[in-house]
């Protein structure tokens, strides 16, 4: 009896210590992120930014360079801290898999992803935010910050997939508790607020049916409405996706191409499957988003929509930062020149 009580007390103390340690770790991460948010705010004030165009005739002073390098260094230290925490969680999982229930691993991933969100937003907003009253960020600084974002994104994706392989989290989008995707930052470009999300693995574009289309990223784009009071007011969000689709190239088509090039076609009997990457927009078809009939909305359990391709990116999967660059470039082109249209 005494041994049973002792074991229960030891278990309770262990769980309490682990909970306190997790809370301490989260507070430490949060404090460091808040500190670096203050640092990052000075990137956009124009104080230590310079035009890298050699024709400008401006060369940054040694003091300017030193201050900028110090700011980058402090943000990089925060990145290394988050990466080390990811390594620590992975080590705990691998070495403790025989007694995993004692470590509360099911809560680690959601908590850690949420903790990393402010740091992602710090990187994305500092690198991409546009302000008409401040000079643009130097390309070198922008590249470093986006590399930090890409590095952390890739590491978190690996960590989520590892925990999912041990059944500590679900990647099924239909599961309310799943971690099929996570936030990798937010930025403000002109009148657009862009929230960026990364799917941990190719996920069916429609959860209700298989279309052969799989999503890898999502962007929620909200446009600011002018003349709506003192505070900023945004229109309803538009949803854009980075998707892939396996396209079968018929053997006859391949043979024709090769025949025209003078190549032999005797062994070309199998079809080739090519994975094509594209960026497109979710367009709702039912209920009609422009209808004022509320009955359609009340009776509809799940809105219907389709994927409208905007950009074709080819066979190679782009990084999350490159894909975001492509989308923002297209959206800004549409805003400026009105030349951007949906590919039918």
Curated annotation (Swiss-Prot):
It comes from the Eukaryota. Pfam families: DUF3314. Belongs to the UPF0575 family. This is UPF0575 protein C19orf67 homolog. It comes from Danio rerio (Zebrafish). The lineage of its organism: Eukaryota, Metazoa, Chordata, Craniata, Vertebrata.
